[in-house]
């Protein structure tokens, strides 16, 4: 039987890190087994679901490259199917109408608490023959009274639930709308889901869903409940720990494959390997090797992994990822066309950058000349250096071959003649004059890329800053 997994987010909020890891694990399991990955949007919470959240989920999945084979399916478009199965269960006696009011059920549970019993619905409407007027009933599932429901979870192992402790679950509200646990069961049944991979906050729902599937004569899927992700402070991951939506990581300059690499390692490992290509993740990932303990989100580790992925791309490939971020800082296509080749700039910055945002900020100076230098850097490195700046302009202007090695030789000579052999005393003023700040890639390589004409023009403009 072909493996069929699903990712089923609710569009009540944006796609977050925990949801992405669940989607990734489901996607990897399907891809490794040559199966199918289904996307389902669980939008039955009409009051909280929004079209914007749905769009953000789809955009996030597309950016990450977590492609789906079927879907997206929307629960709100399947209401007729849910009502059909509800009618089927009522006819079979595996579900029944309950006319008890909320107050009646709460009084029942309070009596049970007073007697030291676990509060649960006592099934008084199971065999009810009279129908009260003017009362819209809910529909309850007739749960087994005794025995146990055993979940053989791929991550948590064998988990046992006593049926006597579970009451008759409401599967349709008094207005006729089906509940979450019922819709999920029908969807998984109809879509032939073989493996349900989801957060372990759903583990307690699983025995109820299994019971409904069994009552329908449906095949019960294999379950794998993934532990939650904690913040660096070991508390539940929340917006106070950083980005809320996965798309914020795109805005911050992370590569999609780097983010997936980071997430796959939160609870799973393959020896001591840290960096994985997408193909390696598919090859090595095993859902039953996921740790059942919660993992902590480490922002510094994410930055390190992103830097590793940036370094492993070709300059040409990384340049394509960089383009939107350059546009965001004002480096447009005409500027790119008139400046140095972008892959050459990328190659110079590749070992120094942790994110695409960081790289774009560093690359900007190759295409946009600084209008003025950073005041503190000008004060520290250019103040009183008019003569040195003029000498540098003359020496560099006399260079016949504009190459990094030749530029380096000029800087060395100026250091000997004007700075007691201290390279920094020449390189830093030169850097501030050309880049507008005291931080840049190696200055000789920087000038070589900028070109002779542009370098000399910037040196002359910088003289006005002093």
Curated annotation (Swiss-Prot):
Primary enzyme class = ligase
Q: How is the cofactor bound?
A: Binds 1 zinc ion per subunit.
Function as written in the Swiss-Prot or TrEMBL entry: Catalyzes the attachment of glutamate to tRNA(Glu) in a two-step reaction: glutamate is first activated by ATP to form Glu-AMP and then transferred to the acceptor end of tRNA(Glu).
Record key words, sorted: Aminoacyl-tRNA synthetase, ATP-binding, Cytoplasm, Ligase, Metal-binding, Nucleotide-binding, Protein biosynthesis, Zinc
Which GO annotations describe the biological process of this protein?
A: glutamyl-tRNA aminoacylation
Q: Which InterPro entries match?
A: aa-tRNA-synth_I_cd-bd, aa-tRNA-synth_I_codon-bd_sub2, aa-tRNA-synth_I_CS, aa_tRNA-synth_I_cd-bd_sf, Glu-tRNA-ligase_bac/mito, Glu/Gln-tRNA-synth, Glu/Gln-tRNA-synth_Ib_cat-dom, GluQ/Sye
Q: What species is given as this protein's source?
A: Acidithiobacillus ferrooxidans (strain ATCC 53993 / BNL-5-31)
- Residues that, per the record, bind ATP: 239
By what name is this protein known? Answer: Glutamate--tRNA ligase 1
> Keyword Ligase: yes or no?
yes
